[in-house]
Curated annotation (Swiss-Prot):
Key words of the record: Cell membrane, Ion channel, Ion transport, Membrane, Transmembrane, Transmembrane helix, Transport
MF (Gene Ontology): mechanosensitive monoatomic ion channel activity
Biological role: Channel that opens in response to stretch forces in the membrane lipid bilayer. May participate in the regulation of osmotic pressure changes within the cell.
Subcellular location: Cell membrane
Family designation: Belongs to the MscL family.
UniProt xrefs under SUPFAM superfamilies: Gated mechanosensitive channel
Membrane association type: Multi-pass membrane protein
Gene3D superfamilies found in the cross-reference section: Large-conductance mechanosensitive channel, MscL, domain 1
NCBIfam families: mscL (TIGR00220), PRK00567.1-3 (NF001842)
Lineage: Bacteria, Bacillati, Bacillota, Bacilli, Lactobacillales
Protein name as it appears in the record: Large-conductance mechanosensitive channel
Record note on quaternary structure: Homopentamer.
UniProt cross-references to InterPro entries, sorted A to Z: Mechanosensitive_channel_CS, MS_channel, MSC/AndL, MscL_channel
Length: 123
């Protein structure tokens, strides 16, 4: 059982996934730092606040920190854009798979069925 587990872990897909998760978490930290330390100060110049994460409004005593949401949206958009660029670049580098040959059309299938039915009637 231990050998099966080792064989499973050493397969390419599992290792690729593990590397992807590790790099992804490191990249998320990098993007968070980019948003917090570079993008937020630029946006705060326009918002008039030193820190966007401190933006909030209160309704009936409930505090809604929409500044944190803005930071999270910026992080998501940056990560999504980078992933888009990576996928686009990889698709350009890797050869595309040839298209599967098209099967017979409906008319060809119906003609074949008709011919088979005629043969059955003649026998």
């Amino acid at each position: 059982m231990l050998k099966e587990f080792q064989k499973f872990i050493m397969r390419g897909n599992v290792l690729d996934l593990a590397v992807g998760v590790i790099i992804g978490s490191a990249f998320t930290g990098l993007v968070t730092s980019l948003t917090k330390n570079l993008i937020n100060p630029i946006l705060s110049m326009f918002a008039g606040k030193a820190d966007l994460s401190g933006l909030y409004f209160t309704i009936l005593g409930a505090k809604f920190t929409y500044g944190n949401f803005i930071n999270d949206v910026l992080n998501f958009l940056i990560i999504a854009f980078v992933v888009f660029l990576l996928v686009k670049g990889i698709n350009r580098i890797l050869p595309s798979k040839p298209a599967k040959p098209a099967g017979p059309t409906q008319e060809e299938l119906l003609t074949e069925i008709r011919d088979l039915l005629k043969q059955d009637q003649q026998v």
